[in-house]
Amino acid sequence: MYERILYPTDFSDEAVKSVDYIKELKGAGATDVIILHVIDRRGLNDLARFAKKDFAGILVDMEQKARAEIRPVEEELKGVGLKVKVRVEQGGPCDKILQVADEEKVSIIIAGSHGKSNIDSMLLGSVSYKLVKRVNIPILVVKK
């Protein structure tokens, strides 16, 4: 039923907890997981000035850090017999998640209910809320 899972992560507690649900779906026929981390470029110009580093250098650092944080999750999911693909993308989180879901032809998205920035969620609306409103496939939103 849910053979291909998209797991967008920002490494928040809720996102990490989602891994348990992904492993449960292995027993229900899941075969593939796409782990996605989206680097949100908003505000990076200010960060580059503050860090006295060029924009491209910051993006490279962020991608390397994301891949390092994903690696243990990738190994854990492979350890239960799932095929895992890792994608680190740049863009608006909601739009990029929807784009990757379409490109990868996933059957379900499993996402955390809140990201790392609760203030951002209160001001702008959470990514999970936007996904629920816009997605055309099943989505499981995992609470802490």
Task: Kindly give the residue locations of the regions a language model identified.
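Small/aliphatic-rich secondary-structure junction motif
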Residues: 1-53
